[in-house]
Amino acid sequence: MATQTACRVCAGELSLRVVGSNGHAPLAEAFAPSLHETGRHGDLLACVECGTVQQPLLPAGDELHELYRDMRDDAYLGEEAGRRATAAHLLDLIGAQVGGGRLLDVGCGHGLLLDEARSRGYETVGLELSRSAARHARETLGLDVREAPVEDFADDEGFDVVVLADVLEHLDDPVGAVQGCAGLLRPGGVLCVVTPDPSSVIARLAGRRWWGFVPAHACLLPRATLRELLAARGLVISTDVPFVRSFSARRWASGLAERLGPVRAPLEWLAGALPDSASLSLALYDERVIIAHRIDVQHAPQPLLRHRGAAATVALVLPAYNATRTIPDVVAEIPVEAADRALLVDDDSHDDTTSVALAHGLDVIRHPHNRGYGAGQKTGYARALLDGADVIVMVHADGQYAPGLVPEMVAPILEGRADMVIGSRMLRDRAIAGGMPRWKWLGNRMLTAIENRAFGMALSEYHTGYRAFSAQLLRSIPFLRNSDDFVFDQQIFAQVLARGARVVEVPIPTRYFREASSVDLPTSIRYGVQTLGVLGRFVIDRRRGRWPLLRRAAGDLGAQRP
């Protein structure tokens, strides 16, 4: 077994997942993209914190680069038609976000995706270490391909699209690669990542026979961890779908024959009987396409808040959707002496939320697509942390919670008495008098009683959206792995309490009116069921310690220097 080392992604502890059959570093031929023979890899270790599967046997840095430079894949172009169809499908997904401009393909191989992109009007550049593949791209296809690793590549013009397709798993520093590629994006540009998912159902069912376990794969990132790393770079995820590959039907049959022992013989017969022209496009749901946008903050021409010069910086985060009517009143209530910055996250509203917010002094990040209440929090918290906030307060843009209470919300944190503060409508229990429907009041009470038992707490409610966090606490929990839906609120509670954080409640009034509370009964029922699911996972994790949401954060949300 290989000597255990710290995880390359989060520095967590590694444990053996798959025993390898090869105790020696592979030769260059083992790195060919078309080679997917199982059982030729070294020991595969999985991080107990972020779940990344890594192969410590492989060399790193320049030594790894040299192996790729010497690598030849003479079989690659035998499936050129299918590979071009696969590239076309990927470009369809990219084109739905960015329809033109400069495109960089990192690890472009023989240049098939670049050639397809050029035919669609993109201005293309490729990076490829393999001398033979890069030569084919330049001399046969006439493409601009440079033989340089991504960490050494710089371009002052920037790119509208950066593609990392079937590349991230080959790199010994995937975090550095994501950071470098994000830095190459122009404002509004997208990073498209395609990589196998070791946390997928197919990967777990296939076990050691999974196609992702091959000699060339240095780091295999679970879907949730990859999303976390992208969001921690300030990127906004807009697409997360299974990858569709196109190959000849014969190749599909022969590939399955290698992995499905009991039915190998009939599959091999089928592979031999199929005509060469037959092709098939399939998604096995064990490889993802994730597209993330660089969305810059739109700054208000006349900011409502300015840096106060206080020892601690307080940032307000306002998730918003169709909040044109309520923003003016919310802004009017914000005490300007209590915070340094207010950032509204517009979840692709259909009204004038963004323009109204800017006109009233709020900075704005606008999602390219509607993603959900939890997604708005993730975007806002991540941006505030990257900008150096010390305390972050969520203030709803719909006016449901009183912005005038921001000083009371942040005081326990600034005084060192709390890591998280929640504004509770139940401490004085005037919720019904404030307009809360009785069925919501009853559901709140029942769920809170169950949660107190599961969490071992005695809080008056868990279902308030008025919350304040210390930056230190938020950076210590993997909230970027949480749901984009309403259950985000309960997942982050589980994460906070699993850390043993200090939670203080502050009484707040209840405000219910049409714009402030649009959650209907079916949505509330779904939320309740999801909350019970969170509690179940929390209780089980205390015994087994396997829930990724309660593990160490992988994304670095430290303040970025200008």
Language-model features: locations:
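Acceptor/aglycone-binding surface of glycosyltransferases and processive sugar-polymer synthases
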Residues: 365, 369-386, 403-486, 513-532
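N-proximal low-complexity "stem/linker" segments adjacent to membrane-targeting elements
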Residues: 298-333
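Short, acidic, metal-binding catalytic loop of nucleotide-sugar glycosyltransferases
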Residues: 332-340
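Conserved N-terminal segment of class I S-adenosyl-L-methionine
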Residues: 1-165, 175-179, 242-243, 255, ...
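S-adenosyl-L-methionine-dependent methyltransferase catalytic module, highlighting the catalytic core
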Residues: 172-183, 190-295
